[in-house]
């Protein structure tokens, strides 16, 4: 009886969670993630190149963002600037879609049957849970993206090219490194869920406080300019707090260097480069992720409101 009771309560809990699932959030999140990454992929490439720049001789030396972009353009043209774009778009679209999908379901589940709004810590935990669930699915795509972006001899049709595309990379990593290879950087990636958690917490609170400030309903839809402002502020806050983990993660996923684990990366980076090593690439990262975040959130908010309104009209 006890086992049946636990089983019944467990299935009841799951059915309650799934009652809050809205596929509109998934579609809207995918739309925002894909559009923002297609527009700003070259800056993501620059960020990755700078993040792993640790003095290794085989790597090109870059003097700044513009020098990096022009060097890649001269060597490989537009295709070089969009190296790794396929897994990036797949990964970003899927990640944002799943993140918004899980986050809104968790948030709705937690607010069911209560009059008061969620506390800041509840937004934080909900976003962290959504981020961890998303990473379990998407980590192999991020490893693939990093490997493709770090092929420095990526001349078209080059016989020296290690990976030929997204699926070739996935197959080769699995063949030579197994599942463990596909989940390199997973631990710092889990820590990275704190970035999304902080961002979503700040985003929710800023929207709420802003609507209260101008005497609007808490859930009132914002204008495009207002969404951009709130998204930009929340992203800058999150980046400033969590950037070092991205450097650690990128170095773990880099095929040109071998590290035994997270502690090894942190120790070697600190010894060779000091605190600055953990913030390499932050300038191109901020330049890229702030507008990318704004595009993602503006597209998400507008598409989700449109789709959810359609759902209501069909009832």
Curated annotation (Swiss-Prot):
SUPFAM superfamilies: Mitochondrial carrier (SSF103506). GO terms for molecular function: FAD transmembrane transporter activity. Keywords: Membrane, Mitochondrion, Mitochondrion inner membrane, Repeat, Transmembrane, Transmembrane helix, Transport. It catalyses: FAD(in) = FAD(out). It comes from the Eukaryota. The keyword Cell division does not apply. The chain crosses the membrane at residues 26-43, 89-106, 123-143, 186-203, 227-243, 281-300. The keyword Ligase does not apply. It is a multi-pass membrane protein. GO terms for biological process: folate import into mitochondrion; mitochondrial FAD transmembrane transport. It is found in: Mitochondrion inner membrane. Disulfide bonds: none annotated. GO terms for cellular component: mitochondrial inner membrane. Solcar repeats lie at residues 20-109, 118-209, 222-306. Signal peptide: none annotated. It holds the Pfam family Mito_carr. Facilitates flavin adenine dinucleotide (FAD) translocation across the mitochondrial inner membrane into the mitochondrial matrix where it acts as a redox cofactor to assist flavoenzyme activities in fundamental metabolic processes including fatty acid beta-oxidation, amino acid and choline metabolism as well as mitochondrial electron transportation. In particular, provides FAD to DLD dehydrogenase of the glycine cleavage system, part of mitochondrial one-carbon metabolic pathway involved in neural tube closure in early embryogenesis. Belongs to the mitochondrial carrier (TC 2.A.29) family. This is Solute carrier family 25 member 32.
